[in-house]
Swiss-Prot record:
It is a multi-pass membrane protein. This is Phosphatidylglycerol--prolipoprotein diacylglyceryl transferase. It is found in: Cell membrane. Keywords: Cell membrane, Membrane, Transferase, Transmembrane, Transmembrane helix. It comes from Staphylococcus xylosus. PROSITE patterns: LGT (PS01311). A 1,2-diacyl-sn-glycero-3-phospho-(1'-sn-glycerol) binds at R136. The gene is lgt. Pathway: Protein modification; lipoprotein biosynthesis (diacylglyceryl transfer). GO terms for molecular function: phosphatidylglycerol-prolipoprotein diacylglyceryl transferase activity. It comes from the Bacteria. The chain crosses the membrane at residues 21-41, 54-74, 88-108, 176-196, 234-254.
């Protein structure tokens, strides 16, 4: 008889409070991303408090908007179960909502502090995509965000570790570990952004982040069974991915042709807005 090593979504309990792996992993991704960004921001010459403010407030409002975004597209359920709306520890946050909330918050702080949002975006972009890659393991622990049914033999032929295969056995069926596909794509994106950043112009790394992440998300989303749907045929995440790819490409072209942005490695802190460099 096959024995499955099933992981409990609850890491430990503190009295009446159940602490889930989901929250621990999300927090770990944010912290690791912060330390990586901290090393980058030192090289440019920004004050450390600036980075703390941007990451802290962007994370806070990012989570809030991510939850609101998710609830809006699942409104028929939450109108019947309003008490569950704040229960983010059960899962149910949408990364695209988080990106919207985080980006808007970051831009506001950059404006207030008179610093260049594209330069800060270049600093934070590798940390963001790494954090997203780590965060997908929170979905794994919650046994969510998976693909359609698949046989165990197919998963074994993909040389996926047994502990992952075992935990893809949900309600009597094995499922595609789409969390893993997206996580690996994001981690590869982190490596690429780190290696290329010093050779790119200010703003390019952030734009490449939008493009790289969105390409991967578009294809992975097509395999998922729990997608937020705009209509019966249109997945919200795929539509948002297309929009972000276009935004990334357009901004990169405009900043290269119209503004001739300086190279990332050649400048110190830039003010808002980015000065033209011929």
């Amino acid at each position: 008889m096959l024995t499955l090593n099933y992981i409990d979504p609850i890491a430990f309990e503190l009295g009446p409070i159940s602490v889930r792996w989901y929250g621990i992993i999300i927090a770990a991704g944010i912290l690791l991303g912060y330390f990586i960004a901290q090393a980058s921001v030192k090289k440019i010459g920004y004050d450390q408090d600036t980075l703390v403010d941007i990451i802290f407030w962007s994370a806070i409002f990012g989570f809030i908007v991510a939850r609101i975004y998710f609830v809006i597209f699942q409104w028929p359920y939450y109108i019947q179960n309003p008490i569950e709306i704040p229960m983010i520890w059960h899962g149910g946050i949408a990364i695209h909502g988080g990106l919207i909330g985080g980006f808007v918050t970051g831009i506001i702080i950059c404006k207030q502090k008179n610093i260049n949002p594209f330069q800060i975006g270049d600093v934070i972009a590798p940390s963001m995509i790494l954090g997203q890659g780590i965060g997908r393991w929170g979905n794994f622990m919650n046994h969510e965000a998976h693909g359609g049914p698949i046989s165990r033999s197919v998963l074994e032929n993909l040389h996926i570790p047994n502990f992952i295969i075992d935990n893809m056995y949900i309600d009597g069926k094995y499922y595609q570990p789409t969390f893993l596909y997206e996580s690996l794509w994001d981690i590869l994106g982190f490596v690429i952004l780190i290696l290329l950043r010093k050779h790119l112009r200010v703003g390019d790394t952030f734009c490449l982040y939008l493009i790289w992440y969105s390409i991967g998300r578009f294809f992975v989303e097509g395999m998922r069974t729990d997608s937020l749907m705009l209509t019966s045929d249109i997945r919200v995440a795929q539509l948002m991915s297309i929009i972000l790819i276009l935004i990334g490409v357009i901004i990169m072209i405009i900043r290269r042709v119209k503004y001739r942005s300086p190279r990332y490695k050649d400048v110190g802190p830039l003010s808002w807005p980015n000065p033209k460099v011929k």
